[in-house]
Every structure is written in C-alpha cells, then in structure tokens.
From Swiss-Prot:
Belongs to the class I-like SAM-binding methyltransferase superfamily. RNA methyltransferase RlmE family. TRM7 subfamily. It is linked to Intellectual developmental disorder, X-linked 9: A disorder characterized by significantly below average general intellectual functioning associated with impairments in adaptive behavior and manifested during the developmental period. Intellectual deficiency is the only primary symptom of non-syndromic X-linked forms, while syndromic forms present with associated physical, neurological and/or psychiatric manifestations. This is tRNA (cytidine(32)/guanosine(34)-2'-O)-methyltransferase. Pfam families: FtsJ (PF01728). It comes from Homo sapiens (Human).
Length: 329
C-alpha cells in the first residue's frame, strides 16, 4: 500500500496535512463552530483528551489569536508543544487536574470545554458505547469544576441504543443539548457530538471529583437528581452537500485545486501506545496466539468430547485479518 492510498481514501486526512492540522478531526470542530458559533465571546477554553492536538490547534488560532485568549490542553499522553496552548499531562478524573486548569486561568472559570476523546474500540458495540459514555461523564464532571455559568460543553458520543439516557444526564446541567454530526465525520460511524450550551447546574449541586460519575455506587448524589431518565434531542448535520464526503474516495488532483504533491503528517504522535506493536509488525515478529481455552464455550462444547491435547495456533503478521491493526512503514 503506497503513501498516496490513504490520501485517495480519506480526503479530510489529506486536507488536514495540506493545511497544517495535526489530524483530520480539526475539520469536525471547525464545522461545529460554523453551525453553532462556539467561539463567539470565548476567551478561555479547555481541550480535554487533547492529543495529538488538532482541536487545540483550532482553539489556539480562533481564540488565542485574539491576543487575550487562553487555551489549556489536557491529556494523559505527551503532546508536542503548540504556540499559545498550555499543556497539562494529567488525568481528567483527578481533582488536581481541575485545580491546575483554574490556576492557569488565574482563578477564572472557562467559557468553553471540549472533549474529542474516545477509548480504543473493541468491535463489541455495547462495550464501546458504554466506555465512551463513561469517558464523557468523566469529562462532564471536570467541566462542572472549571466551566462558568452559561458556558458551553462539546464532547464526542457514540449513538447507541442507550444514548437517550446520556442526553438526559447532560440536560440536568445545560439548558440546551443537541446531537450534531459534522460533514467530516464518516456516515458509516456512530460517532457524533453532544453540543451542550447554557451551563446551569441544579441548585445546591457541589462538584466532587472523588465521585467521578462512572457508576451509581460512586456517585449516589448525581444519580438521585430529579428529571426524566431518557429524552430525545434534536439532531443537527453540520455542513451542506458542497462539502467533501468523508466516506468517498477522491482523485489525487482535486477539481479546482493545484497539482497533487504528497504531504507528510504535520506532527507524528509522541510515544503512542501502539508504537511497540508497529515496530514488531515491521520486523515480522508480531504474532497472535489462539488457544482453545481462550475461546468461548458453545452449546456443542457442553457435550462429552474425546480428550485431546491442547493446541496453540499462531497467526504470523502476513496471515492477519484485514481488520487487524495496520501500521504504515
């Protein structure tokens, strides 16, 4: 697979490199802002789960470029420096992280909190949706510590069967909750974004990061709040048909554009968690072991079977399925 193949398959990936963005997700925030004017009047913004930093880039240009704007980026992983962005390598479920954010804002709360984080997907949709919901609630919890009344919160969601419960939890804290799908987000993906405006916590609510909103046993106060348990919110598409289709392949020479020239990524990730696996695959040393005892027991397996010695099947890297991880050389 050549270097240009992904440029053909993913036009937003290609445009991100050509425009100096660290990732294609920058277009998602730009399209959300075009629809909802997220940056209007914003001088202090927080980017949670910020690495590799494309949303922080957008915030820096839209807010920090005004001279009086301040942007704080938070992530567990290291991130290459960005001009006009204060970086915190920390855990969003820790109170110390919230205090450090406020400290950088000189005691003032933030106008906008965004979160484009997502867990490593497993392919089990129920598990992925649950993990994403818990990550969003953790982001919401830290937002309640740093967001000013009337502020805005934008976070990635997976539109599963239980997303209506998530909407009801968000509406407890915000006067307006919408589900938005940017044009640069693939139609084949269940990804969308919760756009929550008008932060207005319940009377008497005291944020507490010792209870990270991850389960009813952790935070009984949050789960005892009154209100509907499931609601339906408006669904908004960001961008019209004149925008590029994120699910379509495009020729290298785009209509009305200059002659194609390959552009390397703007900023490769720093010490990504998959780095070791990529190194092993390049050397042909990546293997996947499948043992009978690791497989789920089917109904047929419950009947008596002749005893046989356990076997270990090894699939070398060239034999891996198409949906396994692929790393460019």
């Amino acid at each position: 697979m050549g270097r240009t193949s992904k440029d053909k398959r993913d036009v937003y990936y290609r445009l991100a490199k050509e425009n100096g963005w660290r990732a294609r997700s920058a277009f998602k925030l730009l399209q959300l802002d075009k629809e909802f004017q997220l940056f209007q009047g914003v001088t202090r913004a927080v980017d949670l789960c910020a690495a590799p930093g494309s949303w922080s880039q957008v915030l820096s240009q839209k807010i920090g470029g005004q001279g009086s704007g301040h942007v704080v980026a938070v992530d567990l992983q290291a991130m290459a420096p960005l001009p006009g962005v204060v970086q915190i390598q920390g855990d969003i479920t820790q109170l110390s992280t919230a205090k450090e954010i406020i400290q950088h804002f000189k005691g003032c709360p933030a106008d906008l909190v965004v979160c484009d984080g997502a867990p490593d997907v497993t392919g089990l949709h129920d598990v992925d949706e649950y993990m994403q919901a818990q990550l969003l609630l953790a982001a919401l919890n830290i937002a309640t510590h740093v967001l000013k009344p009337g502020g805005c919160f934008v976070a990635k969601i997976f539109r599963g069967r239980d997303v209506t419960l998530l909407y009801s939890q968000l509406q407890v804290f915000f006067s307006s909750v919408l589900c938005a799908k940017p044009r640069s987000s693939r139609n084949s993906s269940i990804e969308a974004f919760a756009v929550c405006q008008g932060y207005d916590p319940p009377e008497g609510f005291i944020p507490d990061l010792s209870k990270p909103l991850l389960d009813h046993s952790y935070d009984p106060d949050f789960n005892q709040l009154d209100g509907p348990t499931r609601i339906i919110v408006p669904f908004v598409t960001c961008g019209d048909l004149s925008s590029y289709d994120s699910d379509r392949s495009y020729p290298l020479d785009l209509e009305g554009g200059s002659e194609y020239k390959y552009t390397p990524p703007t900023q490769p990730p720093i010490s990504p968690p998959y780095q070791e696996a990529c190194t092993l695959k390049r050397k042909g040393q990546l293997a996947k072991e499948i043992r009978p005892q690791d497989c789920p027991i089917s109904r047929v397996d419950t009947f008596p079977q002749p005893l046989a010695a356990p076997q270990c099947h090894t699939l070398l890297a060239p034999e891996m399925e198409d949906n396994e991880m692929s790393c460019s050389p």
